[in-house]
Amino acid sequence: MSTQMSVFLSQEAAQPQWGARAILSFSEAGATIHIGEGHDLGAVQRAGRTLDGQGIALVALSGKGWDLESVWAFYQGYRGPKKKNALEWDALAEADQVELEARIRATDWTRDIINKTAEEVAPRQLATMAAEYIKSVAPAGTVKAKIVKDKDLLTEGWEGIYAVGRGSERTSAMLQLDFNPTGDENAPVFACLVGKGITFDSGGYSIKPGQFMTAMKADMGGAATITGGLGLAIERGLNKRIKLILCCAENMISGRALKLGDIITYKNGKTVEIMNTDAEGRLVLADGLMFASAQNPELIIDCATLTGAAKNALGNDYHALLSFDDELSHQALTAANQEKEGLWPLPLADFHRGMLPSNFADLSNISSGDYTPGASTAAAFLSYFVDDYKKGWIHMDCAGTYRKSSSDKWAAGATGMGVRTLARLLIDQAK
């Protein structure tokens, strides 16, 4: 007897015995998702989550109505971190099937690497895994990758990454990846993508309480998300030269670790006083943004699980978008809307740049005072390391990267949210 369950779509309401608001009902034929006349993709994703939660490990999407977006919605909800469910669907139109498979590859890689333990993904391993993934989806010969590690970081002047990671026994690393499909080694760099890759964040000497540390294997979620976004863009046909810079370190406590009151002198001459070692993401991103600016690209995007303030403001359902470039922000929000992902703007203004005073350095790594806008001042800090911060730069504070517990739509763990938005934004901007 087959243990596979067929799942159908219906615009009709469920029979009364299933409840007035039921989105799922069962019969001898299998399960039916009741999507209403509006083709509710949220209902499809919630049904996928419910079936996974019931331990149904073999599903066939059957009958009429299954298109690219509905199959994708079901897959998102049905996928969990602890086991590999088997999902079948009738072949879609060729272009839709290609797109679906590319989405699955990109978001599976993103979700899987975020869900791995910090023991499995050290800073150098993160850089290596990201480079291997991009090489696996890019045309042969279009990718070159360099990993700068340990004291070589100091040789190249990447003081922030080295300082944050020096308390760990696991060496820090910067991935410098060059995707160049043009065939011209002198082609201009169209965009630089910068990701925060903190593979575990204890908070350092500004140590996190235990309940806030349990999800800190996912503090490299920005690096994973922006890598997945590039991978999907490549599979969608991206034809411009892109550089990916991942800033990878482990924020730990030891006799060598960064201390409060230490001052970092960056490659651009800026000095930063460390007033909180748990505000470390911005310290590593500063190096990546300086590298990016030196490539003179048209576009710089950075992604980071940077602040609790963004998560407090938006919850798990949106990433925060901060930028001085209103037109680019609008285009990013449009891309997110088209890809059905959550992205929401938070304010970033010149006065935020003045909220990082230090008595001993050019800047403090945190803002002072009561009720300071933490997400905005974190982005303002980053702006000091972008040459033309008013144009062509956006910062994504990835509040929706990871869920500590499951919801009605998502399993616990990584979501992959943002990968599609980044891919579309790159493709659209490259036109």
From Swiss-Prot:
Query: Which residues are Mn(2+) 1-binding?
Result: D201, D278, E280
Class of this enzyme: hydrolase
Cellular compartment(s): Cytoplasm
Classify the main location. cytoplasm
Keywords of this protein's UniProt record, alphabetized?
Aminopeptidase, Cytoplasm, Hydrolase, Manganese, Metal-binding, Protease
Q: Which InterPro entries match?
A: Leucine_aapep/pepB, M17_PepB-like_N, Pept_M17_PepB, Peptidase_M17_C
What Pfam families has UniProt attached to this entry? DUF3663 (PF12404), Peptidase_M17 (PF00883)
The reaction(s) catalysed by this protein are: Release of an N-terminal amino acid, Xaa, from a peptide or arylamide. Xaa is preferably Glu or Asp but may be other amino acids, including Leu, Met, His, Cys and Gln
Oligomer and partners: Homohexamer.
| Record-stated family | Belongs to the peptidase M17 family.
Q: Which NCBIfam families match?
A: PRK05015.1 (NF003450)
- What role is this protein assigned? Probably plays an important role in intracellular peptide degradation.
What's the protein here called?
A: Peptidase B
Question: What would be the name of the gene that encodes this protein?
Answer: pepB
